Amino acid sequence: MAEGEKNQDFTFKMESPSDSAVVLPSTPQASANPSSPYTNSSRKQPMSATLRERLRKTRFSFNSSYNVVKRLKVESEENDQTFSEKPASSTEENCLEFQESFKHIDSEFEENTNLKNTLKNLNVCESQSLDSGSCSALQNEFVSEKLPKQRLNAEKAKLVKQVQEKEDLLRRLKLVKMYRSKNDLSQLQLLIKKWRSCSQLLLYELQSAVSEENKKLSLTQLIDHYGLDDKLLHYNRSEEEFIDV
């Protein structure tokens, strides 16, 4: 209120003719015109200290209020600009981050799909290899099952013959052991000769009995058929005869 009264008092004094002579000399036009009577009066009557102080205060008050309003306006505009710019930049950064994260997720998803496909291919290959191995095994089994019966019978006869030979050899060894324990070697040799002669005669009888009218079996065939030893019988294959008959 005090400043408002001072301003009113100052304007009232500025309107009076006595004070107009004081204010006008401050303008450049008045100072440039030496023929004006007001300039002479202003030179004779300078501005008082109180008026200068009031003028300074009024100018400062007007300028300060205008500057404050202007500063507030500028600051509000700057704040609006910063607030409007920051969200845009933040949203752009967020969008970029989301895009990068989506790219990373897409790359990981592609890698996972590739790994799954490779694992599936490996499983398929393993299953195929197992299936091929099982198929080959089954084929081998079927082939072995489809062998001709004649071949199986021949294998069976061969095994039976080997068993008989082993049993015969074992029986002879037992006889030899028994005779050695009870008798001397001279008697054993006599028994061997008797057994050889009996075997030779038996083979001759078999040859005459088995052979047909037009076809006669050889001693070699009979010996091979029964699996006898040529050395024990003293048989000569080239001549097809016994040595000590």
Swiss-Prot record:
Residues 149-177 form a coiled coil. GO terms for molecular function: transcription coactivator activity. Keywords: Acetylation, Coiled coil, DNA damage, DNA repair, Nucleus, Phosphoprotein, Transcription, Transcription regulation. Transmembrane segments: none annotated. This is Swi5-dependent recombination DNA repair protein 1 homolog. InterPro entries: SFR1, SFR1/Mei5. It comes from Homo sapiens. It is found in: Nucleus.
